[in-house]
Amino acid sequence: MGNKKILAVLCCMALMAGCGNVSKESETSNIGNIKKEDIVSISQGSFEYADGFSGINDLSENSEAVIYGEVLSVKYIVGENGLCRTNLEVKVLQSLKGDFHTGDTVKVAKDQGITSIKDYIDSFADEEMKEVNREDFSEYSDDELEKLYIEQIGENDIMSEVGQKSILFLRKSAFYEEEQTYSRLNGPEGEYTEVSEDQFVNTQTLGGELKPPYTLDDYED
């Protein structure tokens, strides 16, 4: 099966603007069984943020919490009009700013996710939009729609995985009242992924970094 690549400019940032209804969401089941070849469409979002940050000190000053953590679990959710997000449980390995302590579990939400084509289509309330989206995947039968998937991810971001370690610059997400989740400051700009022991690279520059990696000592508040 060919893999469709779609560039999507998502004007409504779910985690920042809260443009979603939690009661109308569905969770992707059996995510551990999803194979790479089952993902037939990748939608890459281009997000615009009001402010940029000059570096880790600027990010830290504007964050409610900064943690070095490890992903314990991953949950994919699709909301209204096909907007996906990922809810993570992250174990705090070291607290660099804020009220969290080593061993705490933090809920982190990201603007990315994987959903079945069926759930994606069903998430649209407008019948005309359902028909348009069904036509986009007309080469697949109704049965196949339940077993094939769409991936959504922000530009210059990476998909989260269990065991992944990173430094996260956090603030309360738009879903905090319902789910007590935090989100990264400016998406991938607010995350530094551990590429080797105590070596961290900004997530949005992974693979093309021009600066040497940071260490935990560089993040002392």
Regions found by a protein language model. Name each.
Residues 69-71:
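Conserved hydrophobic positions within beta-strands
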